[in-house]
């Protein structure tokens, strides 16, 4: 009788294996290593090009000319590479400022200090 109750009956829910839980910070470190190994761009192309076109159209509108700017795809890609390299370097300096202050969390004042030191 006891053996029969242990067997699965029709209609019983299928037991799903539990998802493995990692210690706090393990997945974050894995994600950091993944992005450090990769060389692909992290900002999506379409939103970046939209922002660039919007800023350039505002810039052209200030000079009251009727000429719109056209962008080559290679120019947008080059600009995106430079922007991402700038941001990565800024975050590296910001992290160093936080470490210097004996913290592991970056704060706004770390980024302000990094920009002030770099002259950006």
Swiss-Prot record:
Post-translational modification: Ubiquitinated. Is degraded through ubiquitin-mediated proteolysis when not protected by its association to the kinetochore.
Domain of life according to the entry: Eukaryota
Region of interest: Disordered: 1-26
CDD domains membership: HFD_H3
GO terms, molecular function: centromeric DNA binding; protein heterodimerization activity; structural constituent of chromatin
Cytoplasm keyword on record: no
Coarse class of the protein's main subcellular location: nucleus
Any one annotated GO CC term: chromatin
Keywords, alphabetical: Centromere, Chromosome, DNA-binding, Nucleosome core, Nucleus, Ubl conjugation
SUPFAM superfamilies named among the record's database cross-references: Histone-fold (SSF47113)
Gene3D superfamilies: Histone, subunit A
Cellular localization per UniProt: Nucleus; Chromosome, Centromere
Gene: cnp1
InterPro entries linked to this entry: Histone-fold, Histone_H2A/H2B/H3, Histone_H3/CENP-A
Stated name of the protein: Histone H3-like centromeric protein cnp1
GO biological process: CENP-A containing chromatin assembly
Task performed by this protein: Histone H3-like nucleosomal protein that is specifically found in centromeric nucleosomes. Replaces conventional H3 in the nucleosome core of centromeric chromatin that serves as an assembly site for the inner kinetochore. Required for recruitment and assembly of kinetochore proteins, mitotic progression and chromosome segregation. May serve as an epigenetic mark that propagates centromere identity through replication and cell division.
H3-like: annotated segments: 14-120
Summary of subunit composition and partner proteins: Component of centromeric nucleosomes, where DNA is wrapped around a histone octamer core. The octamer contains two molecules each of H2A, H2B, cnp1/CENPA and H4 assembled in one cnp1-H4 heterotetramer and two H2A-H2B heterodimers. Interacts with the inner kinetochore. Component of centromeric nucleosomes. Interacts with mis6. Interacts with sim4.
Family: Belongs to the histone H3 family.
């Amino acid at each position: 009788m006891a053996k029969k109750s242990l067997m699965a009956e029709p209609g019983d829910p299928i037991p799903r294996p539990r998802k493995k839980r990692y210690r706090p910070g393990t997945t974050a470190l894995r994600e950091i290593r993944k992005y450090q190994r990769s060389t692909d761009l992290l900002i999506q192309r379409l939103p970046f090009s939209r922002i660039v076109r919007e800023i350039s159209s505002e810039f052209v509108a200030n000079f009251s000319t009727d000429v719109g700017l056209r962008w080559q795809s290679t120019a947008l890609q080059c600009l995106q590479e430079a922007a991402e390299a700038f941001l990565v370097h800024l975050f590296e300096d910001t992290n160093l400022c936080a470490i210097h202050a004996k913290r592991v969390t970056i704060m706004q004042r770390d980024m302000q200090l990094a920009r002030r030191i770099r002259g950006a």
